[in-house]
């Protein structure tokens, strides 16, 4: 058994940091050590910011984004085209699309994808609220922007089935060759999808 080299407070900090996606035990130890070395400049302000976030962060009742206000900043933006809704798996996807800045549409966060093997069914996701949003009217297009995985495609098909008969255009993101990508480095599935989704030039 390894000897303890620090007190329980720092051990707890390391254990909590190790739960952050992308940080394993070693990275968490390095991060914790860096934080405690920079106690005044970094650890204190970080603890304060985290406490503030803990008190103020909410889930948007309209789209599922995280913000300090409800409805969120995105839903409250009157310049957005509310008739176009981009459906994403999680908040990180929403933020990524916003960084791209390609569309000024509304969003809907599902909170994951259907995965019967993991016990995740339609009732575990934010699908009913999406169907209700479309049923209210005023939605012209739904862009399904989920990952190109089996679970993502299953979720896309399920949503399409739920919206059958409603006056809404349903599209999905194009799949294929990334900008700057070289064909030799792409997998067969990506190449096949790119060929099927080819467009005229």
Swiss-Prot record:
InterPro entries (alphabetical): DNA_Rcmb_RecR, Rcmb_RecR, Rcmb_RecR_Znf, TOPRIM_dom, TOPRIM_RecR
Zinc finger (C4-type) boundaries: 60-75
Swiss-Prot/TrEMBL GO biological process terms: DNA recombination; DNA repair
One Pfam family cited in the UniProt record for this chain: RecR_C
Top-level lineage group: Bacteria
Cited function: May play a role in DNA repair. It seems to be involved in an RecBC-independent recombinational process of DNA repair. It may act with RecF and RecO.
Protein's UniProt name: Recombination protein RecR
Gene that encodes it: recR
């Amino acid at each position: 058994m390894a000897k303890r080299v620090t007190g329980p407070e720092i051990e707890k900090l390391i254990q909590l940091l190790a739960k952050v996606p992308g940080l394993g035990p070693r990275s968490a130890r390095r991060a914790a050590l860096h934080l405690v070395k920079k106690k005044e400049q970094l650890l204190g302000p970080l603890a304060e910011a985290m406490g503030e976030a803990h008190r103020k962060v909410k889930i948007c009742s309209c789209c599922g984004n995280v913000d300090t206000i409800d409805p969120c900043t995105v839903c409250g933006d009157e310049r957005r085209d509310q008739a176009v809704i981009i459906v994403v798996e999680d908040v990180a996807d929403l933020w990524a699309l916003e960084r791209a800045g390609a569309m000024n549409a509304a969003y809907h966060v599902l909170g994951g994808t259907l995965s019967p093997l993991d016990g995740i069914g339609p009732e575990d996701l934010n699908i009913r609220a999406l169907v209700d949003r479309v049923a209210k009217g005023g939605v012209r297009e739904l862009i399904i922007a989920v990952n190109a995985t089996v679970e993502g495609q299953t979720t896309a098909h399920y949503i399409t089935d739920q919206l059958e008969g409603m006056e809404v255009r349903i599209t999905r993101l194009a799949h294929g060759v990334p900008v700057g990508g070289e064909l030799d480095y792409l997998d067969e599935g990506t190449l096949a999808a790119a060929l099927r989704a080819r467009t005229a030039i």
